[in-house]
Regions:
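Cytosolic, membrane-interface loops and tails of multi-pass inner-membrane proteins
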Residues: 20-45, 250-281, 347-354
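Long, low-complexity, intrinsically disordered cytosolic termini of multi-pass membrane proteins
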Residues: 333-355
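Extracellular/periplasmic helix-loop-helix junctions in multi-pass membrane proteins
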Residues: 296-314
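Alpha-helical transmembrane segments of integral membrane proteins
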Residues: 268, 277-293, 302
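N-terminal hydrophobic signal/anchor transmembrane helix of membrane proteins
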Residues: 223-230, 315-332
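"…together with the soluble PPM/PP2C metallo-phosphatase catalytic core" -> "…together
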Residues: 1-248
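Canonical bilayer-spanning transmembrane alpha-helix
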Residues: 221-222, 292-297
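Membrane-interface capping segments at transmembrane-helix boundaries
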Residues: 23-27, 256, 322-339
Length: 355
């Protein structure tokens, strides 16, 4: 079912192109500037996403038949890639970037990539109608920005994206979706080739052109793979992307409570908090490991709902406890730990009365 030439080619293209992109970007001044939020030193290229994009496009052109949905996928992802590239080179306003994300989502809808029908148990079907339109835009913009926000450490966004794409591809094998398998694995191995140079200490960054492209592709592939499906399968991409989703929602809540703008950057993301205690390389390993666990729970959920749900709950509880302990949202935000303390106090009172 898997054509090994199809996954080897994007890897090799990315491995060959990335050093060329690095040399060109340093020559033309497209390198990351040091500031209070960065964790790197020196001039490092920030348009490594060019290699990932070209590896994907070239391989798709050779191996994948361009039907209507594939055309929508390529056009929409190209809009996001060039949006990120322009932002990497000259900076664009957040509102302009968001507008272009909406346009890219509309392209997907036009080419038939959206959730039109949700099938519930007992044969019940819900025609989403206009809700499908809204859901697709929110989903695409949300996941695209979630992957973009998590791109703060060497190899983090790329590593997590590879894991998510491999899991989606593995699920596609079970579902006998050769089209989905091809797209997911081509993108995964193209990204893997880039990670050869992006692993800590990175000699090149993927930049917004890479993270926006990957985020958009993951959101689009998820819609393409779980279109017109049950609530169970619709939950799978959410489960796979749980870590960046949690990080994004925490950032929104944190910045709202502090009176900051949503697009205003800070150093309170999950990876920043972990790095203070575990260091750069170990933080990336932990984050990718958690993503793999979420992927495992998604895979287990397809095979056995009870086991998958149990794994998911345990991981979510661990992440929530970390968020509260690290004051990621606010020093006063600790509902789960607070609940546990209240239960402990009431238990002591009950035991004292019994005693």
């Amino acid at each position: 079912m898997i054509d090994y030439k199809m996954i080897l080619l994007p890897f090799l293209i990315s491995v060959v192109l990335t050093p060329l992109v690095k040399q060109y970007s340093i020559y033309c001044g497209a390198y990351a500037k040091e500031n209070k939020r960065t964790v790197h030193h020196g001039k490092i290229s920030r348009i490594g996403g060019v290699a990932i994009y070209l590896a994907f496009i070239i391989t798709m052109a050779i191996f994948v038949k361009a039907d209507r949905q594939i055309k929508g996928l390529v056009i929409g992802s190209s809009i996001m890639f060039f949006t990120g590239l322009i932002d990497d080179l000259i900076d664009i306003k957040p509102l302009v970037k968001l507008t272009l994300e909406v346009i890219a989502a509309l392209v997907l809808i036009y080419f038939g990539i959206s959730v039109d029908i949700i099938r519930l148990p007992l044969g019940i079907q819900i025609d989403t109608g206009i809700i499908s339109f809204i859901f697709t835009i929110i989903w695409v913009a949300g996941i695209t920005n979630a992957v973009n926000l998590i791109d703060g450490l060497d190899g983090l966004s790329g590593g997590m994206s590879v894991i998510v794409l491999v899991v989606i591809g593995s699920i596609a094998i079970i579902e006998r979706r050769s089209d989905l398998l091809s797209i997911a694995f081509i993108l995964a191995f193209g990204t893997l080739g880039f990670l050869v140079y992006n692993a800590h200490p990175a000699s090149i960054f993927m930049g917004d052109c890479g993270s926006l492209f990957l985020g958009f592709m993951i959101s689009a592939i998820s819609l393409l793979g779980f279109k017109s499906s049950t609530i169970l399968t619709l939950a799978l991409p959410i489960l796979l992307l749980m870590l960046p989703i949690i990080d994004t929602l925490s950032a929104i809540l944190r910045r709202t409570l502090k009176g900051m703008k949503f697009m205003e950057a800070d150093k309170s993301h999950i990876h920043h908090l972990l790095m203070r205690q575990f260091g750069h390389r170990n933080t990336v390993i932990i984050m990718c490991g958690l993503t793999a666990l979420f992927g495992l729970s998604a895979f287990a959920y397809m095979i056995n709902r009870n086991i998958g749900f149990l794994v998911m709950v345990i991981i979510l509880l661990a992440v929530e406890i970390f968020i509260e302990k690290s004051a990621m949202i606010s020093e006063k935000f600790h509902p789960l730990i607070g609940l546990w303390h209240r239960i402990q106090r009431k238990s002591r009172k009950i035991f004292k009365k019994v005693g």
